[in-house]
Amino acid sequence: MNTKDLILALNAVNADGAHLLSIHIHHWKNTNLEAFQRITDKFDSSIYMFVHDYSTVCSNFTMLRHGEFCGYGKISEEKCAGCQYYTGSLKNQNEYKKIWNKLKNRLMFVFPSDVALKVWASAYPEYENLCCVIPHQKCIGKYKGNLNNKSSVLNVAFIGSREDYKGWKVFLELYNKEKDKPTFKWFYFGVDDVGVSNIKCVYVDNRQDPMAMLNALRQNNVDVAILWSLCKETYSYTYFECYAANVFVVTDENSGNIAFQVLKNGNGKVVGSATELLNLFDNDITNNVYRFKTEKKTGPQLLLTNDRILECCDSCNLSNAIGEKVINHLKIRSNPLLYLEIFHMKLRKLRK
């Protein structure tokens, strides 16, 4: 379907008495901006932009330079001097802002965490009043498993993508330093075969089963997870899977929402450098884990999709709507019993 056909189809639906309530945008990479503007010019629907990474700030979506966070604030010649991404990112920002300024009266930016909002809004302070936070998941109940393990051996895991910016290199450094100690068993959870002796690979693919990783962490009684993301994670499903399995999380202070949640929930330790991580395993990791298990700071029994997403559906007047508020002239109604149909635009598939 091309842009013209889509507009004709939506007009036909409107003619039958329906109404396009809202448009949800989940990514701007490779988006046909002209097609998007043609659609928004035709329809007065509310626009919700879901920010899942920092690609609208910089085309280097991790915002890492030489393995370190670039810093808060707007991109500028002074801040980004010598960066290969600067010129293209500045061009993109100018194009985005032209569109956003035109839509200001019906636009809302939705973030999965306060951390993500803080980083993004520091680059776009003029839109901060159009921002809100809706986490991807809700934590339900209490999981009481994996807290009574009195074994003298700790199960230590790396979880998910083995990219350097996710901390795989640091995990291997830790493994190589500690691998001969009988106090640790080493695990990798994901889709790869890491090919490293004494690292047990547990195949997990959440694409086949969304609960696969959580179940695997619980079944294997993982004690410690090294979540050493170098970038400011906007959310981190992996963290919440660890939280729900009562796993002690060790993370870097620059890991974004991972570090924020560890400090908030008290289910791990935030350290300042890889050197501090190595020292922790040399000296006090066992005491830290046993103290955590003794305090029984339980994680959730269930992780459910957050139905607050329904707040981003502008409903008609429904007698069973249970709440309404106005943000930026947008009527936000919340009704957990009713799933409103969402028009989810996949702009990369649109052609001129």
PLM features per residue range, with description:
Residues G71-F109:
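Membrane-proximal helix-turn-helix segments that form the acceptor-binding/catalytic region
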Residues N101-M108, L117-C139:
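Helix-loop-beta element that forms the nucleotide-linked donor phosphate-binding surface
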Residues V110, N148-K166, L172-Y175:
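Conserved donor-binding/catalytic core segment of Leloir-type glycosyltransferases
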Residues L214-N215, T238-A245, A259-F260:
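Short alpha-helical segment that forms part of, or immediately flanks, the ligand-binding pocket
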Residues I226-T238, E253, A259-F260:
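Nucleotide-sugar-dependent
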